[in-house]
Amino acid sequence: MIQFLLAAPRSGSGKTTMTCALLMALKRRGCAPCAFKNGPDYIDPMYHRAVLGVESRNLDLFFSAPETVRTLYAKGAAGHGAAVCEGAMGFYDGLGGVSDRASAWHLADTLGLPVLLVVEPKGQSLTLAAELKGLDSFRTPSHIAGILLNNCTARMHALLAPMLEEETGLPVLGFLPKLPEAVIGSRHLGLYTAAEVENLQQKLALLADAVEEHIDWPRLLALCEKEPPVLPVQPETPPARVRIAVAQDEAFCFTYAETLEAFRDAGAEVVFFSPLRDTALPENIGGLYLPGGYPELHAKELSENTSLLREIKQKIESGLPTAAECGGFLYLGQSLTDAEGQSWPMAGVLPGEAKDAGRLVRFGYAALSADSDSMLFRAGESFPIHEFHHWDSTANGVALAAKKPVGGAEWRCGFIDEHFYAGFPHLYWAGTPLPQRFAAAAENYRRDHD
């Protein structure tokens, strides 16, 4: 089985572009590839999914123990001929930027994957060899198996490749030229989502054509051939006992594939709906999940869907088990200011008006602790979370305690009760008791309302 992790010395080196190009090329070759993303990012897996037509999973060693990550990887890779992981940030950049925990290197080390390092030879030549030698020797083993040059000309590749191989001992496996017609734009939370990019499939085809031509495929495939991961025996997915409505559209698109799998494994049927277009919730539901996304970019349309807002407010106030993260939390507030500064009424379930803070707010990983029992949490428990948002609310809640793993910054956040969780923190549900608790609350609600 072909298996590797793509990493880079720093963010902005072209990991996502290179990952998509290689995935498309592997797909064309009949390798039936699957994809994974190191870390908590929601957007890069959307591009993987756009290339492959199958879900991409997140693998995060802050969220999950190594054995859980290995199981998630093996589960996702089962039935595929190639597995490609995309790293995050710089190769060794982990918690707080001062640890290698949860870094791309940590994931490669945990899974035993060869690493292909994506580098841009911009303003460097021999110094690039020194940088690569440093990366290769910084941890033992580094797992670096080869180099891919990004935004590189054929002439530059011909000049650099022999020198880099001689100086570092690492094979240079090829290059991706600069393709202005295949550029993907970005905004305040990273790249545009895959659904928003015009002519995405044509751009992906151009990228795949380029790597087909400029990469030494026999060499790459030989370096990355490994035994398939062993999947532990998994319990059968139980028959669905309750329906959970999951918001999914352009405004609410930050959902992990593993979360939905965990809901199903807990006995729930996942039923999607669009807060932008549907005027009512799905019928006979026992729970409601409102994930994050970009509600601030669609505030007018969300606000004008008054029938759905009224129903959501009424159902939550009647006890419908609900979990709302980040953008979903903002949707339940009093009002949401859009990117142009216009304020729009929202569901009004919670206090608080949300506005653009003009910067990332409480960005990064944290541990979320409960002081009392509720639908999802038990007193004294702690769960890993992350926050990633520019908008902030005048009422973020105080029910839970959050603490960063590096630096120790602390704050209160969230609203909880026996049927409710809402707050800025994104939860990572897989491998925790949270899906079972949510599904149990949903079953109890349906039993009481049938």
Residue ranges and their predicted role:
Residues 1-2, 237-243:
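A short, charged/proline- and glycine-enriched loop
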Residues 240-317:
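Phosphate-binding active sites in nucleotide-utilizing proteins
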Residues 295-374:
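Cysteine-nucleophile active-site neighborhood
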